[in-house]
Design a protein with these regions (language model features):
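Phosphate- and divalent-cation-binding pockets in alpha/beta enzyme and binding domains
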Residues: 85-89, 133-136, 158, 189
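Conserved helicase ATPase core of P-loop NTP-dependent helicases/translocases
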Residues: 75-79, 87-88, 94-133
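Hydrophobic residues at beta-strand termini and immediately following loops
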Residues: 6-8, 100-102, 180
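Short glycine-/polar-rich loops that comprise or flank the Walker A/P-loop
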Residues: 95-96, 121, 140-147, 171-177
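Interdomain linker/hinge connecting the two RecA-like lobes of the SF2 helicase core
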Residues: 1-75, 80-84, 88-92, 197
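A conserved SF2-helicase RecA2
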Residues: 154-197
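Conserved RecA-like helicase motor core of SF1/SF2 enzymes
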Residues: 129-169
């Protein structure tokens, strides 16, 4: 398995950078407010909203990455944090794909995974909260090397669980996992910290 964390210059870099400029002080506030002064929910809500906007701005480039990986003969698993991003990416993709996301029945989830594993679809879009645990998306035949495109989550446990979805014992081909880190952003530091945990 190769895990690539090199920062990416996204097409909407200036908008993404502006949002990170808003995000960074909010994260610092959260660290300072661990004393329980009651403002944590407000700060957390703002951080969540900013992260959602940032992830959505990455979608056009992400769609291109998915298409490039498919053209190279890879099966692609995309892990995102927000439903809006999954929906936006789904609208941009020309190829059929399956979904693993919250609110699905066990049967629907199992069918989505089965369609991906069997090669019926070459792309699966996963919500990290729903597809990060208990889902095996590794290459079991050797016919479709896996590429995972992973939006950074700020939770180390979720991050490591997500890395384990396409890289499993018994995998028949090399896996490439690309963490979608925006260049010159706090994401670089966050992902570096999680990689060492």
């Amino acid at each position: 398995t190769r895990i690539i964390t090199d920062p990416i210059r996204f097409g909407k870099k200036s908008k993404i950078s502006a949002l990170f400029d808003e995000l960074e002080p909010e994260m610092a506030k959260l660290d300072l407010r661990r004393d329980g002064d009651g403002d944590e929910p407000i700060v957390l809500t703002k951080i969540l909203r900013l992260r959602q906007e940032i992830e959505l701005l990455k979608v056009p480039d992400l769609a291109d990455m998915v298409e490039e990986a498919r053209e190279a003969g890879n099966a692609v698993a995309v892990f995102l944090n927000f439903t809006d991003s999954i929906d936006a990416l789904s609208r941009r993709l020309k190829e059929n794909h399956s979904f693993v996301q919250g609110g699905q029945s066990k049967d629907a989830r199992d069918n989505a995974v089965s369609d991906f594993q069997s090669g019926k679809v070459g792309i699966v879009l996963c919500n990290i909260a729903a597809g990060g645990v208990g889902v095996s998306l590794h290459d079991t035949t050797g016919n479709a090397p896996r590429v995972a495109l992973i939006s950074p989550t700020y939770n180390a446990k979720d991050f490591h669980q997500t890395l384990g979805r396409v890289d499993r014992i018994g995998g028949k081909s090399e896996t490439i996992q690309r963490i979608l880190v925006a260049e010159e952003s706090i994401e670089t530091k966050i992902v570096k910290s999680m990689m060492t945990k």
